[in-house]
Every structure is written in structure tokens, then in C-alpha cells.
């Protein structure tokens, strides 16, 4: 069962400039930075302290087509059993964006479904 909102993914053009902004202007700390398994997408997770708060995920390389106001890519719900969430979504006939659960190099696992208005919802396991 999903436990809380884990992070919000924001698509960015320049991940280094965005990290600097979130650190220097907003006072956030870089918690993790990885290259996706596809070798193209760069991800950075930022938060305020070492507590279990909702984080910001910066995403570079997903799409070069960003509107001037930026783009929220998805919301992520934290789970401690990603396989059970996947099975539940299948049983509920959810529209899947991912055909399988993806495991990132740092061990994080995720998959996406669409909400009723096309919004992307990620189930995420740390």
C-alpha cells in the first residue's frame, strides 16, 4: 500500500543550474544524483534535511520540449512493496506507462500509471 508522497519530478533543461538554484536559493540539499539505466536521463533528488520529507526530483534529458513555465513530470507515491502495487494496478485495469518495474543503479524501483486526466503517477520504492 502506498504510504506517502515521496517526490515530485520536475523536468529541467540544465540539471547543474537547477541543482545550484534549489541549493542556493531554496536551501535544499542534494541527496542523490544518478544516471538512469538508459544512459541519457540524469536524475537529482533534493530535500531539506535527512528526514523522510517529500523530495524534488530534477529530470534532465527526458524531453527537450519544455514550456516556458517548466513542467511537473509526475508525482511519486512511496511504497514498501512495489510488486504488490503493480499487481493491484493491473487488477484495477490502470493504464500503464511502464510495461514493467524498473530498477535504477542505486536500487530504487518504480513504475508509472496514468490518472484519469492523463497525469503521471509513479509508485516508488527506495
Curated annotation (Swiss-Prot):
Pfam family, one: Glyoxalase
Protein's UniProt keywords contain Chloroplast: no
UniProt keyword terms in alphabetical order: Lyase, Metal-binding
Gene Ontology MF terms in the entry: lactoylglutathione lyase activity; metal ion binding; methylmalonyl-CoA epimerase activity
Highest rank taxon of the organism: Bacteria
Annotated Gene3D superfamilies: 2,3-Dihydroxybiphenyl 1,2-Dioxygenase, domain 1 (3.10.180.10)
Domain VOC: residue ranges: 4-126
UniProt-listed CDD domains: VOC
InterPro entries given in the database record: Glyas_Bleomycin-R_OHBP_Dase (IPR029068), Glyas_Fos-R_dOase_dom (IPR004360), Glyoxalase_1_CS (IPR018146), MMCE/EMCE_epimerase (IPR051785), VOC (IPR037523)
Keyword Iron part of the UniProt annotation: no
Residues involved in a divalent metal cation binding: 7, 42, 74, 122
Disulfide bonds: none
Biological-process GO terms, alphabetical: L-methylmalonyl-CoA metabolic process
Family: Belongs to the glyoxalase I family.
Protein name: Uncharacterized protein YwbC
Gene encoding the protein: ywbC
